[in-house]
Amino acid sequence: MARSAPAFSSFTAGEISPRLEGRTNIEKYREGLSDLTNMVVMPHGGVTRRPGTEYLGEIADSSVKSRLIPFQFKTSDTYILEFGNQTMRVLRNDLQVLNSTTRTITGATKANPVVITTSGAHGYSNGDEVYIDSAGGMTEINGRNYLVAGVTSTTFQLTDLFGSNVDGTNFTTYTSGGTVNEIYEISTVYTEAQLFDLRFAQSADTMYIVHPSHPVKTLTRTDHNAWTFANLTINENGPPTLTSSNNYPSVVSFFEQRLVFGATNNNPQTLWFSKNGDYGNFHTGTNDDDALIYTIASNQVNAIRFLSATRVLTVGTSGGEYVLTSTNDGPVTPTTTLIRKYSNYGTAQIEPVQVADVTLFVQRGKRKIREFKFVGDVNTGGYSAPDMTILAEHVTEGGIVQMAFQQEPDSVVWCVRDDGTLLGLTYRREEEVVAWHKHVIGGTFSSGQAVVESIATLPTDTGEDELFMIVKRTINSVTKRYIEKMKVFDFGDDATTAFFVDSGLSYSGSATTTLSGLYHLEGETLQVLGNGATHPDETVSSGGITLDYSSTKAAVGFGYDSTMQTLRIESGSVDGTSQGKPKR
């Protein structure tokens, strides 16, 4: 039997469909894999294990879904907005933002439950979530979130986020000081069922938010813990109008210094462009900078599903994809607006992502991601929308419900599948890299896998964009939804800093066998990485674990398996293909 030593040097096709098993004639076959789970394809062709996720905090109400929305003033001043059922919270620098009013602690009892006394009236109500820090003596209560109970004007009892009393009978004695503050939270009009239909566009410190059941809202930031919702004042001379029931827009974007709305219930194919630079002015006219209204003419009523602004305005509808430009290659004006249809795939009601000058959108059936891009030369070219899942149709089974783009370090489009599986698409078209990989987040929900419900990304100045997610699990027999951030592990990083656990926390300090602060994983059996090496699993009790041997650096959280399997090798044979022939 002839010897063969095939080299697998690149995996830029990622995981490919079982339907292509043995299809060695396909160009991407040698770069494909039959399974790639919890591994990320790098643009250079190699693969690396997915880093774990760091626990940042619990959402406002774990009994209902929430959605994460990014807010970026500049790359060094960014926030994650947690929209819940008629609530909004804020994360900055991986921490939940607190109210501006801080109360001073004057007492903490060694009792069950611990009773906190403040220097004056605290103003809290039963069930409010607070954060305690810097208490002297009774350091066990520091750096944690609590729900308050048994409220009087200057005292309250501590319960944990599972609703159980915090037993302080074995804590060290309180001596002095400490602060308590409430988690910053404001009310919104948006219910749980409406959250994933919200669309938004941001200019500086103001975000414009639309939903077909509500008037257009502005969300304005004046400080880390000072955010204000208001109705946008719209000056218009319609019809069609934007300011009454069934006439509220469902999509929004900025384009050529205009605020653009689209798709009301009464006018699903209509676009409204504000006056240039005056975002509340929709008073139409014939001057070049006047507002304008444009209705797409078609044989069918296909509602507008998304707007994507690059050099042109891409308009995705339920029946096809359009490009809006000017008739004279100048700015769009009331007299020069031109819209052309380029494809008939139809789009799902899911926000697309922009990668360079390309718009990636989810097709109407939610199984395909298409790449809407310009092809050809300037004079005779047009737009096409090839299928990015053609070699891996199986990875999107069940449908995609959300997307987010992480530009650095590896140019990955992240997707949430309907069953809560996280999908990744390493996408670098200029290098012909289109590689799918799937990710099962550690932990369980009910009797199945942990469920990813929302994702968002933020840019940074450090060269590593950040991916945030909400993960639903069953923790200590209770449904919990946690906000987590995927960590980063680069080539050359010290193995002792490896973070390959989910919903985890890390420790760095003097050698210890006792790790605390794991209250969010109470009762769960966790994986431990100590000084870069695996450690026997430990179960959390009273928020802590005891290690079998001391560590100066540790990461603790849910473990997960990373798997990679090649396709059947095509190494050739003396009489043709090696497929179907005995091997040893």
Residue map of PLM features:
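Surface-exposed acidic, glycine/proline-enriched linker/cap segments
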Residues: 182, 238-242, 281-299, 380-397
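Beta-sheet-rich non-transmembrane sensory/scaffold domains
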Residues: 244-245, 269-297, 341-350
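Surface-exposed loop/turn positions within WD40 beta-propeller blades
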Residues: 85, 204, 213, 224, ...
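Beta-propeller domains
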Residues: 40, 78-99, 262-290, 324-334
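Catalytic or ion-translocation cores adjacent to nucleophile or general acid/base/metal-coordination motifs
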Residues: 329-367
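Small/polar beta-strand repeat architecture
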Residues: 2-23, 27, 95-202, 210-215, ...
